[in-house]
From Swiss-Prot:
CDD domains: CCP (cd00033)
Lineage per the UniProt record: Eukaryota, Metazoa, Chordata, Craniata, Vertebrata
Domain of life: Eukaryota
InterPro entries: DUF4174, HYR_dom, SRPX-like, Sushi/SCR/CCP_sf, Sushi_SCR_CCP_dom
Disulfide bond positions: 64-98, 84-110, 115-156, 142-169, 257-299, 285-312
Protein name: Sushi repeat-containing protein SRPX2
Domain HYR: 170-254
Listed GO CC annotations: cell surface; cytoplasm; excitatory synapse; extracellular region; synaptic membrane
Alphabetized UniProt keyword annotations: Angiogenesis, Cell adhesion, Cytoplasm, Disulfide bond, Repeat, Secreted, Signal, Sushi, Synapse
GO molecular function terms attached to this record: signaling receptor binding
């Protein structure tokens, strides 16, 4: 009996050994090193049989359930669920069963989850925590002058895809611009303006260094600028249309002297603005007055007038001259002369004329008209101007030079340049004489004075 049992066991062992063939998942003493492998071990006792070899999965876990209980992991009918560690993905079947053929119904292995390599980003870069593995976080940064637009970080997900979208580096930083310093310049002599120059602004783009346009708002360098403050603005644009502006002030200063006071019985004529640096003011006296002092004064850079003020004093008439020309020349640009000649002081025309002029003294003075009388015939002729008497020789020469008749009444009007302007052979109303003077002889300034003082004369 015992011999029979021994023979049967030996025969069963031979049969069992013949079932181990290549590809069956069984081998003598073999340990597989692939990601899912079967550990070779000899068959245990019958009461703890291992029909299939134990499952091992690299970077994962096999959870098995046997009909005989938790102690049995590879008995016939055992089911195992395969899973992978974090960051790995199962390739193959997720559940296998130990079959009667001593094989597992399938196999699987764990592959590391990886995302594709992110493309480079223009004007920037990215840094990833663990490369392209699952869970890796890639943070984007941009070159100086650029900013990230879009997702600043992307994470490699479990499905092997990156979260979010691909960002870009955009130039949002405006260029740097620095204007020239503000400046002030004194207006040029006799001018209310100054020509001012300045350099170009300093412009730099913090991104790619390219400045496309620079605009100027205001006058150009080298412009002739009037008195006051002028704001100069520059605006620069980079290639991304970002802009930056700066401004500075250009000031033109006009140095001025105190206003001059016109002399009594006189007036001033000034160049430029009248009291600015370099302006010249000339003194003038009204008819019948002479200037005492300098003819002009100049406003200096120190804002003071050169010289001393002038005055206007009554004109001194010199009747002790040797010729008619010398007599008339002393009134040059000072007085107009109205010569009245009559054969006698009792002449009717003479008396009518003098009566009319006596009531028009204000009008004559306003128009700078001085009356010179030549009365009578030689040797009893009389000549006078104001309260001064003329010599007989001067009377005779004046009549000859001016071609004035001794035998009848006549008048001659001489302008301030000694030119014969009009003649009268009959008594003439003062208004008619004044109308001729106002129309043809008065300067615009003199006419304005006559109009402004008209009420005083009336």
């Amino acid at each position: 009996m015992e011999a029979s049992i021994t023979v049967l066991l030996f025969a069963f062992t031979k049969v069992a050994s013949s079932l181990y063939y290549e590809g069956s998942g069984h081998s003598d003493g073999e340990i597989q090193t692939n990601e899912v492998y079967v550990e070779s071990r000899p068959l245990g006792p019958y009461r703890a049989p291992r029909w299939c070899y134990d499952l091992h999965i690299s970077d994962g876990e096999a959870t098995c359930y046997s009909p005989l209980g938790p102690r049995y992991r590879s008995t016939l009918g055992t089911r195992c669920r395969l899973s992978c560690d974090q960051g790995f993905k199962l390739i193959g079947q997720s559940s296998v069963q130990c079959l009667s053929s001593r094989r597992w119904s399938g196999n699987g292995h764990c592959r590391r989850i990886q995302c594709h390599v992110l493309p480079p980003i223009f004007y920037g870069s990215y840094h990833c925590s663990v490369g392209v593995s699952e869970g890796s976080r890639c943070d984007y940064s941009c070159a100086p002058g650029y900013m990230v637009e879009g997702d600043r970080s992307r994470i490699c997900m479990e499905d092997g895809q990156w979260s979010g979208g691909e960002p870009v580096c955009v130039d949002l930083d405006p260029p740097k611009i620095q204007c020239p310093v503000s400046r002030m310049k004194v207006a040029e002599p006799e001018k209310l303006t100054a020509r001012i120059f300045w350099g170009n602004p300093q412009v730099k783009d913090s991104a790619d260094g390219v400045i496309t346009r620079v605009f100027l708002r205001g006058p150009e360098p080298g412009s002739e600028l009037p008195e006051g403050e002028h704001v100069i603005r520059y605006t620069a644009y980079d290639r991304a249309h970002n802009r930056a502006s700066c401004k500075f002030i250009v000031k033109v200063q006009v140095r001025r002297c105190p206003d001059l006071t016109p002399p009594l019985h006189g007036y001033l004529t000034c160049s430029a603005a009248g009291n600015n640096y370099g302006a010249t003011c000339e003194y003038h006296c009204e008819g019948g007055y002479e200037r005492q002092g300098p003819a002009a004064r100049v406003c200096q850079f120190s804002q003071n007038w050169a010289g001393t003020p002038s005055t206007c004093t009554p004109m001194l008439i010199n009747v002790n001259v040797n010729s008619a020309g010398a007599f008339i020349d002393q009134f040059f640009e000072k007085q107009r002369l109205l010569f009245i000649s009559s054969p006698s002081s009792s002449d009717r025309y003479y008396r009518m004329q003098t009566t009319a002029l006596q009531s028009s003294g204000c009008g004559l003075e306003q128009r700078h008209v001085l009356i010179v009388e030549l009365i009578g015939e030689s040797p009893r002729e009389v000549g006078r101007v104001r309260n001064q008497q003329l010599s007989k020789e001067l009377i005779e020469e004046l009549r000859q030079v001016l071609r004035i008749s001794r035998s009848y009444f006549n008048m001659v009007l001489i302008d301030k340049h000694g030119v014969d302007r009009d003649r009268y052979r009959q008594p003439t109303a003062s208004e008619d004489i004044f109308l001729f003077i106002d129309t043809y002889l008065l300067s615009p300034r003199e006419l304005s004075q006559v109009e402004s003082n008209k009420e005083n004369c009336d």
